[in-house]
Amino acid sequence: YHFSHIRENILSWIPFTGEENVLEIGSGCGAVTGALCKKAKKVTCIELSRKRSQINAWRHRDCDNLKILMGNFQEVEKTLTEKYDYITLIGVFEYGEAYIQSETPYVDFLKIISRHLKPDGKIVLAIENRLGLKYWAGCTEDHFGTLFEGLEGYPTTSGVKTFSRKEMSAILKEAGDLKASWYYPFPDYKLPMTIYSDRRLPLKGELNRLETNYDRLRLQLFQESAVYDSLLANDMYPDFANSFLLLIGKEKKEAETIYVKFSNERDPAFSVRTEICENSSGRRYVRKLPTEKTSEEHVKNLEKISRELGTFYGREGLELNTCTVENDGVRLEYLQGETLEGRLDELLEAGKTEELEKLFFSYIKKIRRIHEGEMFFKTPEFVQVFGDAEISESCRCSGMSNIDLVPANILLQDSGVSVIDYEWTFRFPIPCNFILYRMIHYYLESDGKRAVLRDLDFYKKAGISEKELEIYAEMERNFQKYMEGGHVPLREMYDEVSPG
């Protein structure tokens, strides 16, 4: 937990110029210190624990812009003479009673910190939501390990407190009418893979990752993904998000970034993050950025892919969102509409499985027409990515293949149909049926409510044999290994790491 690179996701997306002076309060073992050192001109850490300070210093011994001050915050704070562009409280604010000896420690904590901010500076605060849905669903309170302790208002414990959105808002107001932009890390702020905001809340069906309980035994009292959808439909998600990330300042100047999705549980050569941004005029756009220097080529290659695929797909009426190279990443057109996945789910929930099948197969046939123009032949590049699979000589393919044509990446609009993600496009033959296999597999298997469709034999109806299913499952495993390289994603260690 202390050393996972995923910890850095909580703030690595925040735009820095490289000239910032940053104060990190409660830096611990340096979970986010490295990210700050990469982005800022100067980083000062305050940490009470000698052992944790030494670990942090050793981890970041090559950073010449880092200073670690060891001691009690109230004492160290009195010696600070500088003003800071950012002051971070990542998993620290809940310990306010231990940091500040007063009648209103949490309010006073923010008041004291605010004195050290530059006029346009920001406090970056990450904390669990006392009313987070995971606690209702059977997760224990993070700090005390007991069920419902936070939900009931901490009746049997003291020293640590988390807050609801309403409670946190009241603290900000009392601390000097501080302004905050609210973000919602998912599954939580500790190991976030997606960050939502008030300007871009989750969409129905997006919150379906549940393997996130790494520290203690939990109960499973209900299906969280279904309850999330219900909360979203009733505009209640912000009150029940598992965690909050607040950008706090004396003035509310919104960051352009309103959504971040990390794809960095991969080989560094493929490690990226995707952002939705909104400029001052309200216009939205998408950015895809490398999270490592080694993944720049992978990201910038998207611009060329978009031009080549655009011509390729146009024959079947499929468009691609415009992509242009911008600085170290690419900028993509922001498109609005409903995904094919969402439309299929609506039909499923309405019990219209025949209409669902008809719609799904209209796209399966469309993709088949695009990708079966040539006879398949195996290349060294194919073997490198997918393994030496025993592909039938009668398989059809195309010279260029986007294997990620899953329903979630097909956007239905009034003006037409667009493919919104084509990151995994290869310029060598891949069996058309493998692309169709992935279309079906990632729709049926990514949400439990779709299990009822498995008896409809979608694979067989798509012309995929039992033998092919075995081959394509092995190809998919090999592709995942290729994408991950030597990296082992935390999710794959869940059964070994989590106590249940």
Question: Model segments located where?
Answer:
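Catalytic activation segment of kinase domains across protein kinase-like and atypical kinase folds
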Residues: G153-Y154, Q384-A451
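C-lobe/activation-segment region of protein kinase-like
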Residues: I420-P499
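ATP-binding glycine-rich loop module of kinase domains
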Residues: A269-E308
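Short alpha-helix
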Residues: S158-W182
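Conserved SAM-binding loop of SAM-dependent methyltransferases across substrates and taxa
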Residues: C29-A40
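Conserved class I S-adenosyl-L-methionine
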Residues: V124-L147
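A short glycine-rich, Lys/Arg-flanked "PGG" loop and its adjoining helix->strand segment in the class I
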Residues: T104-K122
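Conserved structural core of kinase catalytic domains
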Residues: L320-F386
